[in-house]
Amino acid sequence: MTSETRTLYSQLPAIDRLLHDSAFLSLCDQYGHTQVVDLLRRMLDDARDVIRNTQTLPDWCADWAQEANLRLEKAAQSALRPVINLTGTVLHTNLGRAWQAQEAIDAVMQAMRAPVTLEYDLDGAGRGHRDRALATLLCRITGAEDACIVNNNAAAVLLMLAATASGKEVVVSRGELVEIGGAFRIPDVMRQAGCTLHEVGTTNRTHAKDYRQAVNENTGLLMKVHTSNYSIEGFTKAVEEAELAEIGRELDIPVVADLGSGSLVDLSQYGLPKEPMPQQLIAAGVSLVSFSGDKLLGGPQAGIIVGKKAMIAQLQSHPLKRALRADKMTLAALEATLRLYLHPEALSEKLPTLRLLTRSEASIREQAQRLQARLVARYGDEFTLEVKPCLSQIGSGSLPVDRLPSAAMTFTPHDGRGSRLEALAAHWRTLPVPIIGRIYDGRLWLDMRCLEDESRFMEMMLK
């Protein structure tokens, strides 16, 4: 060790001395003595590494309290940070999918603050069933005989198969063997559930006779899977749920359907593309229908199964149900969300997902133009700011082909360098409330469809 290195080491302060400083006393009050001491030890190690490698002190050694405060603030940030989603994808899987309605938020807060009647029957003063209240609501909305709630739709599909067809064959069209995000594949789920996949038809064409010919003494289910995240077009043929349900009745084999997204209202009345509805499948005679809570329904993450009472009873009594059941916060949020559907006239106002999906292009463009004018002074020296038409997407595998006309604020660097766009996007991601856009065609696009809190957006953009 050189004398210069020894001199630099000697300039590093002792932890005890730092802890008596008023700034560190304040940090100890805020973050706790243990956490501050642990941090100071790491900072000393960092400083020694810099000295050893560069023969200099780190710049932050000039103000240990300031550096400690910055590091503690960063460490204290939640891993689930609120962001401003301007990607153009409304139900963005990586950003948490559906926003919750205020009614759902209030219900969750109430469920967290005090004991609730999760599995308690007030009338009988004994044990109740956690799905009962929601089952009543779901039956009212969908026309089903009963319902079952689990923690997501993948779990719902697994439970349906395991409880009703384990050890048996499940007949599915080749064109419906979907894979969703995270490599969730229908054939893999069947294998995990103990079922044997029996493919029928071809990728683009499946006929009623294909299902009939596939049935044998070991057939447990006929299954329909809604291809919510892709579309097969052209020379195609598929057997609709009503026809498949008729085949099932004729052959005395239950028919189940995985809708994926699942919408409880006819979206076409709001000018949106039509999506299959659980109530339509129930009316057609499908025995069990599963769908998600946090996609088009606009609620919390949940897997919902509606259908025949006897088959729902099979699901409720299966050992997997306990492993996959939803907790009280999820059930509270889902119940509050479902109650909004009892007042359909106000649904597009109260349900954030529907409110965002139904925003008009004109209102989005007006908002973008108004905010752009206020941001030119901040960004105009380096970027050209324009408002351009764009197409939003629903996201989370819902209506993959359809796009929603929207408007975006775009940033184009004067010098044409893509690195400036990357740097700007990276800067926005470091903000206290990160702003997430997308880079495309030499511009950084901020699709304004999902922007509701303008004041917070402007506060972040002007930093």
UniProtKB/Swiss-Prot annotation:
NAD as UniProt keyword: no
Modified residues (N6-(pyridoxal phosphate)lysine): K295
GO molecular function: L-seryl-tRNA(Sec) selenium transferase activity
Alphabetically ordered keywords of this record: Cytoplasm, Protein biosynthesis, Pyridoxal phosphate, Selenium, Transferase
InterPro entries per record: PyrdxlP-dep_Trfase, PyrdxlP-dep_Trfase_major, SelA-like, SelA_trans, SelA_trans_N_dom
UniProt GO BP: conversion of seryl-tRNAsec to selenocys-tRNAsec; selenocysteine incorporation
Top-rank lineage group of the source organism: Bacteria
Pathway: Aminoacyl-tRNA biosynthesis; selenocysteinyl-tRNA(Sec) biosynthesis; selenocysteinyl-tRNA(Sec) from L-seryl-tRNA(Sec) (bacterial route): step 1/1
Primary enzyme class: transferase
Record has Transferase as a keyword: yes
GO CC list: cytoplasm
EC number: 2.9.1.1
Record localization: Cytoplasm
Catalytic activity: L-seryl-tRNA(Sec) + selenophosphate + H(+) = L-selenocysteinyl-tRNA(Sec) + phosphate
Cofactor(s) the protein needs: pyridoxal 5'-phosphate
HAMAP family registered for this protein in UniProt: SelA
Similarity comment text for this entry: Belongs to the SelA family.
Function noted in UniProt: Converts seryl-tRNA(Sec) to selenocysteinyl-tRNA(Sec) required for selenoprotein biosynthesis.
Subunit structure: Homodecamer; pentamer of dimers. Binds only one seryl-tRNA(Sec) per dimer.
Protein name: L-seryl-tRNA(Sec) selenium transferase
Organism: Salmonella arizonae (strain ATCC BAA-731 / CDC346-86 / RSK2980)
